[in-house]
Amino acid sequence: MYAGGDLTHTSSPSAAAALKARKSVSGPVTATAKIGSWMGTPVAVVTAGDDVTLAVGPTWKVVGGWWPSLGVTKPSLGGGPRWVLAIGSDARKGQPLERTRADVLQVIGIDGKGGGGVMGMARDLWVPLSTGGKGKINSAMVAGGPKAQVSTVKQVTGLPVKGYVVLGFTGFKKIVDEQGGIPIVIPKTVVASHAKNMVIKAGAQTLSGAQALAYARERKTLPDGDFGRSRHQGEVILAAAVKAKLAGPIAIPAALTSFSKVGKSNLTAEQILTFTAGLHQLSPLKVGRGVAKGAFGWAGKQSIVILGAEARSLFAEFRDGNLS
């Protein structure tokens, strides 16, 4: 690649196109590589100075990156905007991860220009389901799995969500602890009623897996209930993204390996590698958060949330992949 050789058979079309105008380098190039796996497929990140190359095995095809030393000023990361649905499964011990209600629904978007957003979907939103009929938005996964959950979110929001990642409670805690916790600033003290009244104090701190889960799941003690809970989930996701950005792209393979051990996804290795690398290109000032809200109502004996104009405005705002 650095010597100017033909990349037609060793790169994805988008990466090959980006590197077509590269300037070759004479002499040795010193690089560092880290290897991991995504759902059984080998992945690698190679860094050489400010250059970053993303590759997918087993034949090690270059699928993206950025190469300022070669005169390639624009990152090749699959384009944008793109969205992925992060699902937190309510599965308990012995229950299938992908066929229980979704406890967390967060749409993560990047615009391909250094901006992005995280949009929460409250569990009680009463919407048309991709599996038929109407119901609470998180029930789609019970009837049709994560793909049905994605389809429901797509038809409600109008966003062409690419795919999903799913984690359970235990898996979430394990990943957070393996990564050394999540540094975050908690705006207001929270008492997690569902977690033996665990207290998450206000201020800057690093949350353990158990603390992060308690903060992300608490609803009953919050003045805005499920909306506040969804907001907290977005805060945790953004805090994790900031930590990942500070660790640098070289840490991506280890993170993907950790997730693959406990989570599920329909994203290919190329899709997840370029998407997570895209998160490293984000500017914190160009990333926003939002929660799809609505009016409270009833469907029989069920308490529900009915989407209103504010939520539809949020969906429209997110169509460029940016909520800042």
Named regions from a protein language model:
Residues 1-324:
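Non-catalytic, solvent-exposed segments at the cell envelope interface
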